[in-house]
Regions:
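SAM-dependent transferase fold signal centered on methyltransferase-like domains
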Residues: 1-172
Length: 172
């Protein structure tokens, strides 16, 4: 089964308009998204080419014209998928840590959907155990370890600040 390499949150009351918005915005970059089946209301699971590069362009687009984004909220690339067990997520994160230099400031960012096994704080403690980098910075990190837990699966990414689109924050 194909796995998404881009997650986009949207207003669940306007899924059709959100899908049109995504398609329209990506069409401007000559990109055709493949929408995969998503069991979660308010979340599209999508496959596109080079999602991190696309998001960098969309961040610039949103800064210039935030009105293009009315129905979508967060656009997050996914590097790897694994099971949402602590052990599997730690193993996947450990594989990404080499992308964080010793001098880099970093943080972990977790979003949970249909997952009640652990509270977010407990997850943060357990998942950061495998990150042997000294410089944590929650406000201005160089690197973000993004964990999107969707039931029994977890999408995990190592992102630069401009590789994740947070539309509500950019509109402020």
């Amino acid at each position: 089964m194909a796995k998404a390499n881009l997650l986009v949150t949207h207003d669940p009351n306007h899924a059709g308009l959100a899908k049109e918005e995504i398609t329209s915005v990506l069409k401007q970059l000559n990109i055709t998204p493949e929408f995969l089946k998503s069991e979660i209301e308010g979340l599209f699971q999508i496959t596109i080419k080079e999602p991190k590069e696309v998001i960098k362009k969309l961040v610039k687009t949103c800064k210039k014209d935030p009105s293009m984004f009315r129905m979508t909220f967060h656009w997050v690339p996914v590097d790897n998928w694994c099971k949402s067990t602590i052990e599997d997520m730690q193993k996947t994160i450990k594989g990404l840590v080499k992308g964080i230099d010793e001098k880099d400031k970093w943080k972990i960012d977790i979003a949970k959907r249909c997952y009640e096994k652990y509270h977010t704080t407990e997850l943060i403690m357990k998942l950061t155990d495998v990150v042997e980098r000294p410089k944590v910075d929650l406000k201005n990190p160089d690197k973000i370890i993004r964990v999107d837990i969707i039931g029994n699966d977890a999408g995990i990414s190592l992102l630069n600040k401009d590789e994740m689109l947070n539309i509500p924050a950019l509109k402020q």
